[in-house]
Amino acid sequence: MDSETDTDTHSICNSVSSGENYKSPESSDCEGYATPLASSLTDISNVINHSVTIKVPDTIADANDLEPGERTPVSTPRAISPPIVKQVMYLQKPRILVMTQREIHEECCSSEEEFYDVDDVQIRDVAQQLLNGVSDDKTETEAGNNDVIIAEEDRADTPIVIEDTREFEETYSEEDERQTPIQMENATSEVSSSEDEISDSVVELTNDMMSKITEIEEIHAQVHSESFGSSDSGDHLEVKSEATNFPEYSNTEEFEVPKNDYVTVENVNESTIDSVVIDSQTPTKDTKNEVNISQNVVNLVRLESHLENYDDETTNTVIAECVYDAQENEKCEKNEEDDLSPVLDSNKIKNSPESKFCEFRAESECYEQTEETDQIKQFVPLMEVSVANQEFDELCDIERNGGNSKDRPKDLNENVKAFDAEHHENSVLEYEQLPDVFSEITIAKTPIPVVHENSISGVSKESQVSFNQEAVQNELMPTHIISDEVETSSTTADNNIPFSDCSTHKVKVDFDGYSSGKEESLSSSTSSESFEFAEPVTENHIQDERAQALRNSIIERYPSNDTDDDELDSVGDEFDEDLLAVKQISAEVEQLVAAINAFGRDEEQQMSAYMVGKKMAAEKKRKSAMDTTAMTSSCQDQTVQTDNNSFILVDRHVPEVMESLQVEIDRLQGDLEKVKSGEKELLQINSKLKEELEESQQTIDGIEIEAEQQYTELTSEIDELCEIVQRKDQELAILKEKVTNVINIENSLKDDVDSQKVIVQRQKEIIENLREELDAITKKLGEVTKLRDKAVEEATLYKMKNMERDRFLSREAQMSMEIEDLQRELNKQKLILNQTSMAKLADTFDRKVLHLENELRERDMLICKQNQIINSHRKSPTGSVITHRKMQPRASVLAAAGNLPSAGSSSESFQNGLDVEAREALLSFILSDRHNQLANIYNIGRILDLTPQEERSVERHLTKDRFT
């Protein structure tokens, strides 16, 4: 769970001190006393060999707007603090176990009604009783205040009343008729754990209890030898001037019952006053009052204080349960009744004007403190908290209402301080020196006590019934206190044997006043459902953001060690209905799956397990209902009876709690209806499976009949096949004869094949000879082809030579003709030279030389190109014609330009090569000066189809002539 409580019980003879260690609901870092706070303080106290006190200054409480119920310091050695009474009531969740279908079918009606309807009626009755008991708070409080004043005045003279055993037995019988007794689980019938596990747990519990028995017997012997010498000694009421958060010294008022002692505590809790817990310690007079550890004795007394200055304020009451394992046999009890002296007075009850609402006011009597009780008190850890001392003294004076008792709290305070100085060296720690972790402890904030009584006799009887009910529960369920773990087991006839052959039920004590049981479950069950009844947490639980920040820091510093299952089952401060719904659905699905899977393995065994689990679940639901009734019915007296280890106070918010309880009951009823429907579905599935089984049996019978028919048919077929085999054997003999004939034929054919092989060998020899001759012929043919190729090459070379020779002759003729032309021009130039100067002649000569050189270069180029063309024609005769045709325009252009010999002398070739425009342009180019020639050189090059290289050479030539 998110918040846990731990009860520590110190039993010293007849004096009992009980404390509760609480922590914040948000923190769930550990269980029991294994908290960082408790462990750290315990280490400090062990080092200094005495207790440690934490003093919280008032300035810190005022600065943080602290209110009662918000913070409390913690003392060592066990970090005990008063209980946190929150406005939330937690009830333990019943476990719904998975059972088999056959048991449901056998007990479908009676068991289902018993399983589903037992607790609902009881819960409704308890809810109605609680609603009737808290109807009028203010009227009862005012009437009760006056009753307390009168009771305090008469407290010193009250006689001592001791109940008789017969009255106790009568009350027990009446209570047994009114309420169903709590039934515990039997190890032989209901506990699903194995015998080995039970034996191991019994051995462990026996060892733990024996160790505690030895310790308590030693303390008991010391106390009897030192403390109980005088028969007239009483108890002093020890009240500390500073409000204590641990029950130290208390006023004693007891209802003497053979098996029960009742202790009252008082808490006056206002905005500046912390809880004052007064515990009683009543030593017995007789040394024969031995303690039996196997039985449970509960001291429960209630004392209310009257506040004159706070008529309209809430009077807070903390009910502290002091539990210890001490009870004697019946013979010891009878002897004790004869020896015990009167100690307490019976309750004075005043009737209210209304018959329905009465206030029960307990009276407390103060006795002088003897030296023997001082020796007992040194076993009780001391704790001091810095609070308003004067206000507490004033409240104590108002409570006593007497001049003789006005100075008593101061005297008591002085006695307590003297006792502290004498027996303890109490170390005081300032709150500022503590780490931030210590700021998370909270003080119990208790509600207004409201008690409903119809008459004086009714109240007295009802109180006795409640007390006797606790005794009945103690007889039925002896509680073995082992640190923070309580084990309750059903009693046997021998009460002197605490560890008999009975099933134990382990209960973990939580930090919020309720117990989370470790439920046993069947091995066949897969999951269990649980529920909680919780009142919505209001905003008053967290007063400021700083407190929340401190809680978060503690949670981060000390993370949770709980399992995922505990986290899923926790409710915390906010109730998450969605999470519970998901858990319920998943649990139901798992139950159905487990029940369906059970039919596949061992149906009868699973069916019996189903019914056993169902009975166990019904018993657990009855027990949870009885626990709820025990807790809520005692709320009429403001006395809550739980497992003797937790606190649940009912205040003015009980109607709201009961409304939430009714809502949870309705939701539980819906869940039970769902389970009922699931069981019906499982029954339907079972019937379907039976029908399928019958159908399968019928199919098997049909298959067997068909198999017999097939067998007869197969036998007839086998006979037919045997006849066929005989015929086949005859045919096989005939075939064998044929095979022998074929073998003979094959032998003759083999002889023929051998003769043919000889013939083929001869033919192969002939073929080899022919192949050699053919190879010689092919060689000769290759040589002939080579000679032919050579001849062709020589012929081509001869042709080429002839062509070159012809071409050379043609060129020579052309050159001769050109030379003649040149000679003519030379003669003309001579004539011109004779008429011109030498410079012009030199110039013209140079130009002619250059012109001739250019023509020679062009001719050489043409010759090379023609040679290339000729070579290409030799290789491809068809390409020569095309190349020749391509070269004709080029030759005509060159002839027109005067490059060719034929174009320079004959006017016919010139006229045929160029058109009129080209002739005019070329003529103007020749006749123009150098500047115009350079300007028109590109036009002439385009007309003459000159290459860029030729155009550059012409341009270079013209520029050279110009500058020279």
UniProtKB/Swiss-Prot annotation:
Keywords: Coiled coil. Residues 656-840 form a coiled coil. Residues 10-27 have a biased composition (Polar residues). It comes from the Eukaryota. Residues 1-31, 169-199 are annotated as: Disordered. The keyword Coiled coil applies. This is Uncharacterized protein F36G3.1. It comes from Caenorhabditis elegans.
